[in-house]
Amino acid sequence: MASNLVVARGGVEFVPPISLAFWRWTVVFLILLPFTYVTLKNNFHIIKKEYKKLFFLGSMGCGVCGAFPFLAGETTTVTNMGIIYTSSPVFIILISYFFFQEKINLTKVIGLIACLIGVFVIIIKGDIDLLINLRFTIGDLWMLAAAIGWALYSIYLFYWNSELKIFERFTLISFFGALSLLPFYIGEEIFYKQT
């Protein structure tokens, strides 16, 4: 996650954010495809059954979580991005509770609080002034959406069983992720003005 946020903050100065996400997942798909092509071809009947779920996973995991941090990087800081992204476990617990009736117990709450405190301390390097002086921007909303997207991806990846092996499944998730970004990539290529 940390390297992704650094790329999000620095990379958008050189490459438009949607392009960065689109090409990232396109390259991932092209790298994986030679290793999974035969299996995917043999399991095409499974892909036909599961493509809607795979598209959703690709849209959340590669589209929302791939592009939104890069969009956020245009207007917010790496510190803000890191702090907001750590809210993902909160959303995972809440969504699992409301939609999958998974119980929230004291152990989960304590673990979550300890995790969030630890991440906050690392991100702000123990400097409370840094936390007090945080300023929020539109980029923070992009990061909040990315955190929710990651939560949805994580939950449905866990709950949706697949007949495909994980390597083949991830190949298709990267494909559908790039596909979900394609119309936005085309729009960005047409309308984006480098500043």
Describe each model-derived feature in a short phrase:
Residues 32, 107-126, 181:
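Hydrophobic transmembrane alpha-helices of multi-pass small-molecule transport proteins
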Residues 49-58, 104-117, 164-174:
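Cytoplasmic-side transmembrane-helix entry/capping segments in multi-pass membrane proteins
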Residues 1-22, 132-159, 179-184:
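Glycine-/small-residue-enriched transmembrane alpha-helix faces in small-molecule transporters
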Residues 21-23, 62, 66-67, 80-87, ...:
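Helix-helix packing/entry segments at the starts of transmembrane helices
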Residues 19-30, 66-108, 146:
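Specific alpha-helical transmembrane segments that line the substrate/conduction pathway
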Residues 1-5, 33-85, 121:
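Specific transmembrane alpha-helical segments of multi-pass solute transporters/efflux pumps
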Residues 6-17, 44, 73-74, 78, ...:
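Membrane-interface helix termini and inter-helical loops of multi-pass transporters
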Residues 7, 27, 56, 60-64, ...:
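Hydrophobic residues within membrane-embedded alpha-helical segments of Major Facilitator Superfamily
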